[in-house]
């Protein structure tokens, strides 16, 4: 994957895009996936969702720094990763 370099509000961001709203950066959160332009890890938001919290509550809980669309993309990225890394059952 290609690293993207962009200047936003005077700050340089270097990351790999996993989707429009989900990125990985070696300098942010140990390279774990985050919501773009934040240090909010998708794992935390997905954990809250898995424990029954509504999307609206999660978005509100992050003070509007993420959107419902971004949360849906986090679900998609996680699902694609899971399916791409399933072990072979023929062993």
What are these model-predicted stretches?
Residues 38-91:
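Long, charge-rich, low-complexity alpha-helical segments
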Residues 1-40, 79, 83-91:
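Acidic, low-complexity/disordered tracts enriched in E/D and polar residues
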